[in-house]
């Protein structure tokens, strides 16, 4: 089933599949004009191309199918908790197009078939959703729902901790403030003991 059908992808804007380098360069050039700069001066002459290439990388998650990331399964008959902690994460706030960064902690209880996915695939899934214009709450839920969709686990728990530079560099200007979001699915939502065990392991330093 497609992730659009599961509500894991936004339908508000048609998803483009090819990055438009030329259009991005023109937009950055116009932005430089708008702030009163000369995009043709020595220090800025190549900036539109550089920023466009950076955007292609920073937003590469828009052009990757999440279904292809969790494509490696192992029949390990494992039925206990799997946790990957402290996954470094860099994303871009969709409100100001400024970075937010931190760590993601991913835990899941394999389904009845005992199948698990590769640990690197979990990190790649975090990267895929982080490399989009995002809000932290949606990012957290998208990771959880993608794992549910692909792995059919008994439970999923996600905790994301991040500093938002839109709070540190501008506006309220509170550097060091950390936002924590979580998403729980399945057994972790219905069983308080399972949820407490997972959170204890995730938050233990």
Swiss-Prot record:
Pathway: Cofactor biosynthesis; 7,8-dihydroneopterin triphosphate biosynthesis; 7,8-dihydroneopterin triphosphate from GTP: step 1/1. GO terms for molecular function: GTP binding; GTP cyclohydrolase I activity; zinc ion binding. Zn(2+) binds at residues 93, 96, 166. It catalyses: GTP + H2O = 7,8-dihydroneopterin 3'-triphosphate + formate + H(+). PROSITE patterns: GTP_CYCLOHYDROL_1_1, GTP_CYCLOHYDROL_1_2. Signal peptide: none annotated. SUPFAM superfamilies: Tetrahydrobiopterin biosynthesis enzymes-like (SSF55620). One of its GO terms (biological process) is one-carbon metabolic process. It is an enzyme of class 3 (hydrolase). Its EC number is 3.5.4.16. It comes from the Bacteria. GO terms for cellular component: cytoplasm. Toroid-shaped homodecamer, composed of two pentamers of five dimers. PANTHER family: GTP CYCLOHYDROLASE 1, GTP CYCLOHYDROLASE I. Belongs to the GTP cyclohydrolase I family. NCBIfam families: folE, PRK09347.1-2, PRK09347.1-3. This is GTP cyclohydrolase 1. The gene is folE.
